[in-house]
Amino acid sequence: THPGAKLNFMGNEIGQFIEWRYYESIQWFLTEEYETHKHHQAFIKALNHLYTAEPALYERGYTDDGFTWIDADNSKQSIVSFVRQGEDIDDDLVILINFDPASYESFRVGVPREGDWDVIFDSDRPEFGGSGYAGEEPYTCSSEPYPWNGQMDSIEIKVPGLAGVVLKRRGPSSYKPPVVEE
């Protein structure tokens, strides 16, 4: 999800044990014999689909206005977050990457716009060999008018350990402020 072209060497799409050899074919049998290779192939396939389906990942991949940090300095939890911008503001994506094995049931992150944000990709999904910490089904996070990370609005999201999560704004926030009784 970081800007720039992606390079994946032959055989990496299945997590091949050995480096590709010009005199041999890729070891496709690994995806049939080992579940981890099958999971890795499903992960790369989903990443490729995400990359081609989301203009924010390629339209401004080589310009400064295609990438904005939300939080690059979270050393306590080792989670970085950023926005990838496309030509259309409705294509913008919020990305969180957790570089630590700790998972978080409720992690607050600033978002560039108010709204309901759908999780459109989670690298911790069971079909990729992950734990499914955030649940089996995609889910939505509604922004609150609670400033965080230099943004006017924020969301709370489940963040799996050692995983990446991609969110896309679906529409206006369905957040309802709590009713204060007097």
Spans of features found by a protein language model:
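Carbohydrate-interacting/catalytic domains
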Residues: 1-8, 12-182
